[in-house]
Amino acid sequence: MRVMAPLESSYQSTRLDANRQQTLNLFPNTLRGYRQFPGHVTFASFQSAGEALTDTNASAVTDSDGDPVQVSINPGGADRGLIADGPNGLLYQVTGSALYSIDSSGNALFIGEISNTPNPVVMAADATQLIITTGGTPDVYVYTVAAGLVVVTDDDLLTTSSVAFLDSRFIYQQPDGYFVVSALNDGATIATLDFAQAEALPDDLVRVFSLNQLLYLFGETTTEIWFTSGTGRPPLSRQAVLQQGICGTYAVDSIDATARVSAYSLHQENFVDFIFSDQGQIWCYHVTSQTWFEKDFMTTSIVHHYDLVLAAHSANKKIYRLDFANYQQDGANMTRRKDLPLISSEVMDVGGAEMVIDKIKLHVDA
């Protein structure tokens, strides 16, 4: 009996249409098998909910028909960004025009409103400050437990759409290839002299990003790497230049220190999601096997926090925990599909000879 392992990567055959090579919600896990992508179990919800509006006497306020007037207590919207380990060690999400903190039990607290919805935000945080950049007007907010949510109004900070945190300072993307560094431990204070320019090549600055104590300045065609040198204004120096850039502000993420991109680890498996929200598609790269598969549950932000992997849905105002003990998507059955490779005489090592296949046996663990 000839054993054919169905582990060949999909989307590579030139003899089949791409839509006949689909791998959906499955990824290679063992030498001869695939594993189901985990289910999505609700962790926190920002779906509109209502409670009766009451007057000063605790009596229900009614409309002209005598029905109680309801007020929204959990506003939410499209996922715009999710960040772990913000002030007080909490999880924070911008959902629609609302900023929420979420504790380890999934309880959410409304903090304030963020402009420029539904565009994604870029956030950075230390133990006491959460900085949110919108690319709109206002373009920068700072949240602290003591002072709440306020707009950053420093005249030395021009319009920005991304921020990073490095060595007790916040670094902001600026127009014309510039970036600016905040005061030590104060993301809302900018000094006039603390500007620098990514100037190795003339491509514009698309994103600032920190990783492994280095600052990455991503342009359209190049990337500059800077480090904290402690000298000069700002106290950073360029270390290297890479001849690759990125396609957009939200197309960068990291896995284990290494379109819109979200990267994450799950049960020692590494994944990178390439997200196309408008088309309702996610192409996922499984780093371990170096193969691709598709996902059909539209999550756009994924973080590790509270010893969980948490994913925010693109539109339904919920955050989910990924759970290998549950193979449903928000309570609905998950469709899984694996198109087998083309069975040909070449695969069976019989050249161009005619074949008759009497029996095919598949092993499926339900």
Predicted regions and their residues:
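A short loop-to-beta-strand structural motif that recurs across blades of beta-propeller domains
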Residues: A98, D139-Y141, T222, K318
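Hydrophobic or amphipathic alpha-helical targeting/insertion segments
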Residues: V122-V152, Y172
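Beta-sheet repeat architectures centered on beta-propellers
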Residues: M1-L109, S115-T128, A240-A366
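Beta-propeller and closely related beta-pinwheel folds
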Residues: E51, N57, G66-A78, S105-N119, ...
